[in-house]
A protein has these predicted regions:
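Pyridoxal 5′-phosphate
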Residues: 1-222
């Protein structure tokens, strides 16, 4: 990892959005990394109906971008509802609280004594204005894996987006983004041997996302 980082600092330091030769070289490095990360996560970031893999500064930014960005992705709609589980990382719970401060409704999905999210209670929380359900793939304290694919199936018919925080699972257990059926998935590189300060948000094709930062056009304007 250190050797790869040193090569990039030496040979790929330019802005990958620039048209000059060093910029295009940097762009090839970035796109190669994007392809490799997508392959690890069972996603497709090339060709028709390609998924989008957005590099971030870490898991916290990826989760915040997912919760706030997807919830507010439809600019014409007013505040709606977001559902999170009771065991989410602070980088999911606090963005949800931020939405609540803006007038959104936030409901919390409870867990069983063994730490598994109560998927059977989800249907009772869904509302016509539900925009997003966010449940982590594996818990950062207990290690319990959550029934994310089941939750995604329950939301798919209603057109509700599902995000999963996979920071603790990526690189340790196989992940197939398409099989999970979620719309967004977050990872952090340092959890599986990568450098600190790098994460990613994987988005299914067609998911609308409100950016957190403005003024740059890289990575689909995010």
């Amino acid at each position: 990892v250190i050797d790869a980082m040193v090569r990039c600092w030496r040979d790929g330091y330019a802005n990958p959005a620039s048209q000059h030769q060093p910029g295009q070289k940097a762009r090839r490095l970035v796109e190669d990394a994007r392809e490799r990360m997508a392959e690890l996560l069972g996603a497709n970031v090339s060709g028709p109906r390609a998924d989008r893999l957005i590099f971030t500064s870490g898991g916290t930014e990826a989760n915040t971008l997912a919760v706030v960005g997807i919830a507010q992705g439809d600019r014409k709609a007013g505040p709606g509802q977001v559902i999170v589980s009771a065991i989410e990382h602070a980088s999911v719970l606090e963005p949800a609280q931020h939405l609540m401060d803006l007038g959104w409704r936030v409901d919390v999905l409870g867990v069983r004594p063994d730490g598994v999210v109560r998927a059977d209670l989800l249907a009772g929380l869904l509302r016509p204005e539900t925009r997003l359900v966010s449940v982590m793939l594996g818990n950062h304290e207990t290690g319990v894996l959550q029934p994310v694919a089941e939750l995604a199936r329950a939301c798919r018919g209603a057109g509700i987006a599902v995000h999963t925080d996979a920071v603790q699972v990526a690189g340790k257990l196989p992940i197939d983004f398409r099989d999970l059926g979620v719309d967004a998935l977050s990872v952090a590189a340092h959890k599986f041997g990568g450098p600190l300060g790098i994460g990613a948000l994987l988005l299914r094709d067609g998911v609308s996302l409100e950016p957190l930062h403005f003024g740059g056009h890289q990575q689909w304007g995010i």
